Structure formats: structure tokens, C-alpha cells
Swiss-Prot record:
Name of the protein this chain belongs to: Phosphoribosylformylglycinamidine synthase subunit PurL
GO terms under biological process: 'de novo' IMP biosynthetic process
Organism in which the protein naturally occurs: Campylobacter jejuni subsp. jejuni serotype O:23/36 (strain 81-176)
Designated gene of the protein: purL
Family listed: Belongs to the FGAMS family.
Pfam family, one: AIRS_C
Entry keyword set: ATP-binding, Cytoplasm, Ligase, Magnesium, Metal-binding, Nucleotide-binding, Purine biosynthesis
Length: 728
């Protein structure tokens, strides 16, 4: 094998030596391609696995933790929620519409593969500076393309996209982030797993035909960008949501039978990863007859068939004798279905082309025992330069308030979420635009499931460990503010180039923060994804661990809103304001800096707040609640009253007026009626949570907070109209 070919497959000299040892000979091109894909960062998690192994993954309500297509938790009365978040960053930067659309398609398949009907989608989007003279126009093009791709696929599939977050920073100028989350619901006893066992059991290919789209996608997603990357459009998969809709319905029909042993989505690295993962998990071997693959293009080679990432395809291990029944279901839905192999006990993948053996590879070294790297780490030098920066006001509070409310990181994103169908399936209780977590009703048990997606990259830049812990806490707090109990998380870890020791240090610290927060807050990790090499021309993104927290409220009718719908409601701030301006939005907007050093998270205070919100809501004491996030109480209150029908007369009583922009954790704003005040304050005392009265909601269409005064019309215009103008 010549060195150029090996290098083109991103295989290092050390890895090639391992390949020679595993095979006992030189690999052929097909084998090299398969091993390259399975050992890519995207499939093997070789740089990250050692840090992920420490995550807490168990709890009495966890049915399935990491290692399957998606995580599963018990949501009561025999029902389960199946969910996962993952990235489609690199393809979305190259081809925004197709990249984002297939990102949605992939995550939907991960969920319905487990036997669940998908009932909700969320997304976390990060773009570059839309005001930048050089790249602003291109960033707007990316925003429009990505949003169009997500809405097209989700809407056509009939899956409601009910929430998300969107942020802008120059660190994403060369690498945008597109993280998609899906949640499905099924009976706890009806979950299917990705396994291939039972010698002689048939392996069946189902779904769409295989083309040349997405070739090398897993390897591309395991590398950083440079000028040449702009020509990579052919490696972006093309999605067809209508085929996926048929595939989902066919799979859900199949799951009502007892015809199959296991099923796996063909995602990154296509047929390669699905076959190796199924056999690897089961300790089996497999024979695949590649010439039987349904092909969309003529003249395709075994190499292309094994590595194509054509969408809307699954691999099924059926029970022997039931092949025809399985095929019949997929034919009914107008999909391809063909027996293309069988399970063996050899522990090897045997690849045939017109009955000739063209590839023979041991499965375990490519799946369960793929190489794990221990990359060098070193603390980034920039941390010592930024840690002592202190924030002081340089303009009037009113000026800063207006500047912040119309900033694209804070203002309303109706331009985005209006493109998503959030009400299809008629289960949506609280969707995007209503602040905080999104909520759906579970008709089968009367409960609701709340979910929130969270990632503040600036905080992770300032302190990767505390920043990641804060993301877990913040996502959980948003769920708690709906009245639900946070139960588990899914994570999508977006970082730069792991070959840079400073990036690897950020990653290790981020994992430590997630591990600590999940343990202390009792929200285990049940699924996730790692996206590395988010780097262009040597510049890495800020560390960006996206966290989705999922919680349950036993009675959907008790779901809390985030808006004030009545006058004369008492407005309270819960939790302590500690003057946390490090990595804050106010610092970024006023000083154009991301600096400081974060305070450790007080987990006891965070948990006490969650417990208080849950108990107060169970006792019907609250009218509304919302987590205090970026921009502090100033922005939280502004947004709550912008989406409300009433005005506000509020006073913070802070000694220093800049404190209204403080971003301390473990805080929430609540609204409650005067007759419930005493009972609530007694409860807050019981839980050890400080409650500060800020004022009341009023019938006057006016917003007043300390020295800030605006008419409700001005407030609404700043919040609702700004982004539409900025994105044009």
C-alpha cells in the first residue's frame, strides 16, 4: 500500500503498523477504507473515550445509558422517553441546507431505531459574526440555509421542532455548530437494540438505495477545515424526508411483530459502521454480499458501497425464517429491502463481491476494542491573561439595557422558529418563543416531558470545567422552571483540534465539569456525541458542550409558563446574586471582551432551587417561572414581560446598578398571586432559598426596572423586531 493512499485515509504510521498486526498482512483498498472510517474520530471516539468513561450513567429511572443509538428513561406508567443530541457541524458549514437537513434525519433515525415514535425536536445553532465586514454576509447565508434545512426535514417528517437556542460569536466565523436533538416515546417494554446475534440469522438492508453521496463523511468530520474544504460538497449527504417518513412508519410497523433480533441506523460511515457496531456489540461475526446492495448509481464499487453515507437506510438482523415477512412490510411502504448477509460466529467481517471474498477484517479491533489515544494536554496560556479582568459600567444602565435587548444573542428569533412546525402531532404545551424549556404532553400517561438545550461558549472559554458544569445546571434549571423534575441529560461536545494540547485540556476539563455536575445534580448522562476538529486555518472554536436536560412532570396540566398573564402578580427573584460578570454578555457587548474567572457552582443551592420550584408548583403556588440566564435579571425580566400581556413596576434594591446584568447561577424569576405569597415564602425558607421581592405586574403598558423605563411598545419592538432587521 503506497504512502499517499494511507495518508489520504488519515491513517498515521502507528495506526498502519497496528493494521498490519491485526490483519497479519497488508490491507487492500476496501479494508483500508473500512478501517479508516471505523478508526476515525467520528466513529471511534479515540481521543475522547477515556474522558467519557467517567460520566455517571445510572439511576433507577435510566433504562438505557450511553452505548446504544439513543438513551432511554422511564417517564411513568410503563412509558419511556428515548432521546439523543448530536452534531452535523462540518457538513452544515460546507452545504448548509443539505448538511442541516441530514443532521435532523440522522438524529430522528437514532431515536425511532429504538422503537419510539419521534415526538419532538430541538436544535442548538452557533454562527459567526453577522456584522463582520468580511464574513457577515456569508454567515447570514449560513443561518438561512441551516434553518431552512432543519425546518424542511422536520416539517416534512411531521415531527414538531419545539425549541432551541441560537448564538453568534466571531469564534464561529470559520466553523458553525449545528446540534440537533430528538425525543421519542414508546412503551418501556417495546425498546429495540442494535444487535446482531444468532448464527445463520439473516442481515437485511432496508430503506433507500445507496448512491455516492456522503462518501468519506466520517473521515471529513474528523479533520479540521482549510481553503480546500470548500470543494467538499460531494461528501455532504442528500436527505429525502419523505423517504424517511416511510422508513419510520415501516420500522414502527415492524416493531409490533417479533420478526427481528436487532436494528441499526446507517449513519456515519454507512454500511461499515452499522454492520461493525451490531456485530461488535454482540460479539458475533458477519458475512455481507455487497453486490446485493440496492444501488442508485451504476458501476459502484465495494469500497463505495461500504462507505457511502446515503440517507434513510437501516440494517436489520432478523430471525431466521422471517426474512420474507420483514421484506413484505418494507415493500408495502415502497422501500427497498433485501437480504444481503448473515450472522456468523467467526468474530470477523467477511465482505463478498459476486461470491468472491474481497475483504476479511476482525470486528473487535474496529468496534469494542478500537484504539484509544491518550493525547497530551496543557492549560491554555490565554487563561492567565484574561483571569483578572473586572467589569465596570461605562455608560448609563438604560443605554446598555437597550443595546443588550436588541443584540442578536438575546433578541427574539421568530425569524427562525416561525419556520418550524411546532404544533404538528398536537402534543405541544410550550414551544420556542415562550422562553425556557419546551414541553410536550404524553397522552398515554397524562404527564408532560420538559426539555431544554443549553450551551454558553463564552463561559466555557473562560473556564472549561465550570462552564460545562454551568451548562448542565442551566439546562436543568430551565426544566425545573416548568414544574418538571430534571432526570437525565444528553450531551454534544463540540471542541477544536484534539492534536492541540490546549484544546485537549479544554475537552478534559469540560468532561470533568459535566461529570461533577451530573453526579451532584442527579441527572445522569444517557446519550451523547463528540464533535472535534472544529477548527479552520489553525483557529479553534470556543469549547462548546451542548447539554440537553430532560425532565418529567406527572400532571401535564400543571406545566408552568414563563409569562405574566395577570396584573398585580408579585414578582420575586429566587437565589443569591454574587456579581458574576466573567464571560458575561454585558462584558462582551460593552467591552468587546470575554474575560474573567468563574466562581464554582454551588450544587446545594442549585438543587434547593429545583426542589423549591417543584414543590411550590405541586402546591399550586406559582403562576410563572423562568431561569435567570445571559444578561442577568435585566434581560430575563425584559423577555418575560415582552411575551406577557401586562406591564411591570420593579426595583432590584441592588447597591450597585450594574448588578441587574450579573449572571450568577442558581437563580429564577417567579410570579405568584398575593394570596400565595406567605405560603411560598415559608416554603422558600424551608428549602433555604432566598426570595427577594422585585415588585408587581401592572395593568399599565409600561416596563420599569430601577432607573430603566420603557413603554411596553418600545420593549416589544426592541425584542421582537431587531433580529429580522439584522438578518436581512
Amino acid at each position: 500500500m503506497d504512502k499517499e493512499t494511507i495518508k489520504a485515509h488519515k491513517i498515521s504510521d502507528e495506526e498502519y503498523a497496528q493494521i498490519l498486526e491485526i490483519l497479519g498482512r497488508e490491507p487492500n483498498l476496501l479494508e483500508l477504507g473500512v478501517i479508516s472510517a471505523m478508526w476515525s474520530e467520528h466513529c471511534s471516539y479515540k481521543s475522547s473515550k477515556k474522558y467519557l468513561n467517567g460520566f455517571p450513567t445510572k439511576a433507577p429511572w435510566v433504562i438505557q445509558g450511553p452505548g446504544e443509538n439513543a438513551g432511554v428513561i422511564d417517564i411513568g406508567q410503563g412509558m419511556a422517553a428515548v432521546f439523543k443530541v448530536e452534531s452535523h457541524n462540518h457538513p452544515s458549514f460546507i452545504e448548509p441546507f443539505a448538511g442541516a437537513a441530514t443532521g435532523v434525519g440522522g438524529i430522528l433515525r437514532d431515536v425511532f431505531t429504538m422503537g419510539a415514535r419521534v415526538v419532538a425536536g430541538l436544535n442548538s445553532l452557533k454562527f459567526g459574526d453577522i456584522h463582520d465586514e468580511k464574513c457577515g454576509k456569508h454567515q447570514k447565508y449560513l443561518v438561512k440555509g441551516v434553518v431552512n434545512g432543519i425546518s424542511h426535514y422536520g416539517n416534512c417528517m411531521g415531527v414538531p421542532t419545539i425549541g432551541g437556542e441560537c448564538a453568534f460569536d466571531e469564534c464561529f466565523n470559520g466553523n458553525i455548530l449545528v446540534n440537533a436533538f430528538a425525543l421519542g416515546v414508546c412503551k418501556s417494554e417495546d425498546i429495540f437494540y442494535a444487535k446482531a446475534e444468532g448464527v445463520g440469522n439473516p442481515v437485511i438492508y432496508v430503506g433507500s438505495k445507496t448512491g455516492r453521496d456522503g462518501l468519506g463523511g466520517a473521515v471529513m468530520a474528523s479533520d479540521s477545515f482549510n481553503e480546500e474544504s470548500k470543494s467538499l460538497r460531494p461528501t455532504v449527504q442528500i436527505g429525502d424526508p419523505f423517504s424517511e417518513k416511510l422508513l419510520m412508519e415501516a420500522c414502527l410497523e415492524l416493531f409490533k411483530t417479533d420478526y427481528i433480533v436487532g436494528i441499526q441506523d446507517m449513519g456515519a460511515a454507512g454500511l461499515t459502521s452499522s454492520s461493525f457496531e451490531m456485530a461488535g456489540r454482540s460479539g458475533s461475526g458477519m458475512k455481507l454480499y455487497l453486490d446485493k446492495t440496492p444501488m442508485r448509481e451504476s458501476g459502484m464499487t465495494p469500497y463505495e458501497l461500504m462507505l457511502s453515507e446515503s440517507q434513510e437506510r437501516m440494517l436489520i438482523c432478523a430471525k431466521k425464517g422471517y426474512e420474507d415477512k420483514v421484506i413484505e412490510i418494507f415493500k408495502k411502504w415502497d422501500l427497498d429491502a433485501v437480504v444481503m448477509g448473515e450472522v456468523t460466529n467467526t468474530g470477523k467481517m467477511e465482505l463478498f463481491w459476486h461470491d468472491e471474498l474481497v475483504g476479511l477484517i476482525p470486528i473487535e479491533p474496529l468496534s469494542e476494542k478500537a484504539p484509544i489515544l491518550s493525547r497530551p494536554t496543557s492549560e491554555p496560556k490565554y487563561l492567565s491573561e484574561i483571569k483578572n479582568y473586572k467589569f465596570e459600567l461605562k455608560s448609563s444602565v438604560q443605554e446598555l439595557f437597550i443595546q443588550m435587548l436588541q443584540n442578536e444573542n438575546i433578541n427574539n428569533k421568530a425569524f427562525i422558529y416561525d419556520q418550524f412546525d411546532s404544533s404538528v402531532q398536537t402534543n405541544t404545551i410550550k414551544a420556542d418563543g415562550r422562553l425556557g424549556a419546551s414541553v410536550i404532553r404524553i397522552k398515554e400517561n397524562g404527564a408532560s416531558v420538559a426539555m431544554a438545550i443549553e450551551c454558553n461558549s463564552r463561559l466555557n472559554y473562560v473556564n472549561p470545567k465550570i462552564g460545562a458544569a454551568l451548562a448542565v445546571a442551566s439546562a436543568g434549571r430551565k426544566v425545573a422552571c416548568t414544574g418538571a423534575k430534571p432526570l437525565a441529560i444528553s450531551d454534544c461536545l463540540n471542541y477544536g483540534n484534539p492534536q492541540n494540547p490546549e484544546v485537549m485540556w479544554q475537552f478534559a476539563q469540560g468532561c470533568e465539569g459535566i461529570k461533577e455536575a451530573c453526579k451532584e445534580l442527579n441527572t445522569p448522562v444517557v446519550s451523547g456525541n463528540v464533535s472535534l476538529y472544529n477548527e479552520t486555518e489553525g483557529v479553534s472554536i470556543y469549547p462548546s458542550p451542548t447539554i440537553v436536560s430532560v425532565g418529567v412532570l406527572e400532571d401535564a396540566n400543571k406545566t408552568l409558563k414563563a409569562s405574566f398573564e395577570k396584573e398585580n402578580l408579585s414578582v420575586y427573584l429566587l437565589g443569591e446574586s454574587l456579581g458574576e460578570f466573567s464571560g458575561s454578555m454585558v462584558m462582551k457587548i460593552q467591552d468587546k471582551k470575554v474575560s474573567g474567572s468563574l466562581k464554582e457552582l454551588d450544587y446545594k443551592a442549585e438543587l434547593a432551587l429545583w426542589d423549591l420550584l417543584y414543590k411550590a408548583n405541586q402546591n399550586s403556588l406559582l403562576e410563572c417561572a423562568n431561569s435567570v440566564g445571559i444578561g442577568g435579571i435585566a434581560m430575563t425580566l425584559a423577555k418575560m414581560f415582552a411575551i406577557s400581556s401586562v406591564g411591570a413596576n420593579l426595583t432590584s434594591d441592588f447597591d450597585d446598578e450594574k448588578m441587574i446584568f450579573d449572571e450568577s447561577a442558581s437563580r429564577a424569576i417567579i410570579g405568584l398571586s398575593k394570596e400565595n405569597e406567605e405560603a411560598f415564602l415559608n416554603l422558600a425558607k424551608e428549602f433555604g432559598v432566598k426570595a427577594y421581592k422585585l415588585g408587581v405586574s401592572t395593568s399599565q403598558k409600561h416596563f420599569k426596572l430601577d432607573s430603566i423605563e420603557l413603554s411596553k411598545a418600545e420593549l416589544d419592538k426592541l425584542y421582537f423586531e431587531s433580529f429580522k432587521e439584522q438578518i436581512q
